[in-house]
């Protein structure tokens, strides 16, 4: 039985704990403990799931753990992840993998050195609509991809305290586009600004234009300005086009003669992601989202930020 823990139980960390708790019913996973600096929150959630509470995450290292989810603010990812990795414990780190390229490289190097599974929580790769679109792309149903256009907009949230819209929102679509293009970004240009939230140092609007090594172009619009939340991706190919709605998990494909709504078995992407991580640790498989994938997405996001600042 795989013994797991979660460090950081804010909104996203709570969902990691909830899903591990659900997976316990299959008998393959045991949620050993939770850790958070907020003791009231920690005690509340630990009591809900009937597991040990650790106010200091380092105390979890004394437990017989196989894997851990790291769901803390991005600037703490390296600090929290490395002690677990060095002890041979596999790690699922929420996106982005780290706050800097240097820290991401250090996490990846330690994971390789200690032969542990490292996966990054780019959860949209596990969205059933994205996986179905990937099938159509690989079968050539859209022909050669020419452009991909994503929109990820919505109101301001208090959930994210340490990142603007590029590192928090756009990084999702940066990764999905790389996944669908099966290529790395070659050039990136971005415009970004803070429109409505002057007390926040991070950008609340960004427009990113990228070119991949295989000549596919990508356009991403993200903001925390729009009252209505939208999460969409459109693809133009030489044989057809595709419209994807991330939230509704809908996918529609068109060519000159037909319109097709893809049949999709709708599932919670995060549950698919965590179940996949568990399977990779149990069976020593390479995860769908590797540390290198996380690094590539982070690099593109950071270069977009630099571009938006005129660098």
UniProtKB/Swiss-Prot annotation:
It comes from the Archaea. The keyword NAD applies. One of its GO terms (molecular function) is nucleotide binding. Keywords: NAD, Oxidoreductase. Gene3D superfamilies: Dihydrodipicolinate Reductase, domain 2, NAD(P)-binding Rossmann-like Domain. InterPro entries: Gfo/Idh/MocA-like_OxRdtase_N, Gfo/Idh/MocA_Oxidoreductases, GFO_IDH_MocA-like_dom, NAD(P)-bd_dom_sf, UDP-GlcNAc_3-dehydrogenase. Transmembrane segments: none annotated. Oxidoreductase activity is reduced by 50% in the presence of 2 mM UDP, 2 mM UDP-Glc or 3 mM UDP-GalNAc. Activity is unaffected by metal ions. It holds the Pfam family GFO_IDH_MocA_C3. Catalyzes the NAD(+)-dependent oxidation of UDP-GlcNAc. Highly specific for UDP-GlcNAc, does not catalyze the oxidation of the substrate analogs UDP-Glc, UDP-GalNAc, N-acetylglucosamine and glucosamine. This is UDP-N-acetylglucosamine 3-dehydrogenase. It comes from Methanococcus maripaludis (strain DSM 14266 / JCM 13030 / NBRC 101832 / S2 / LL).
């Amino acid at each position: 039985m795989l013994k797991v823990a979660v460090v950081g139980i804010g909104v996203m960390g709570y969902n990691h704990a909830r899903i591990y708790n659900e997976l316990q019913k299959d008998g393959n996973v045991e949620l050993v403990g939770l850790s958070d600096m907020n003791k009231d929150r920690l005690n509340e959630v630990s009591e809900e799931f009937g597991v040990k509470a650790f106010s200091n995450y380092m105390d979890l290292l004394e437990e017989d753990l196989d894997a851990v989810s790291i769901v803390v603010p991005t600037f703490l990812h390296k600090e929290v992840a490395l002690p677990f990795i060095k002890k041979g414990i596999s790690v699922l780190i929420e996106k982005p993998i780290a706050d800097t390229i240097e820290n991401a490289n250090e996490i990846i190097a330690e994971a390789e050195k200690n032969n542990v599974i490292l996966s990054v929580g780019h959860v949209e790769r596990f969205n059933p609509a994205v996986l179905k679109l990937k099938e159509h792309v690989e079968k050539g149903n859209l022909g050669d991809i020419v452009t991909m256009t994503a929109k990820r907009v919505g109101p301001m949230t208090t959930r994210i305290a340490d990142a603007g819209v590029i590192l928090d929102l756009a990084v999702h679509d940066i990764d999905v586009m790389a996944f669908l293009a099966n290529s790395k970004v070659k050039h990136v240009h971005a415009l970004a600004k803070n429109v409505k939230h002057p007390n926040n140092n991070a950008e609340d609007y960004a427009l990113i234009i990228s070119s991949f090594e295989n000549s596919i172009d990508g356009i991403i619009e993200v903001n925390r300005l729009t009252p209505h939340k939208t999460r969409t991706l459109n693809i133009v190919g030489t044989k057809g086009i595709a419209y994807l709605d991330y939230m509704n998990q809908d996918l529609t494909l068109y060519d000159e003669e037909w319109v097709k709504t893809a049949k999709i078995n709708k599932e919670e992407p995060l549950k698919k992601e965590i179940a996949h991580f568990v399977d990779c640790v149990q069976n020593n498989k390479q995860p769908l989202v590797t540390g290198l994938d996380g690094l590539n997405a982070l690099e593109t996001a950071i270069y977009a930020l630099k571009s938006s600042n005129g660098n």
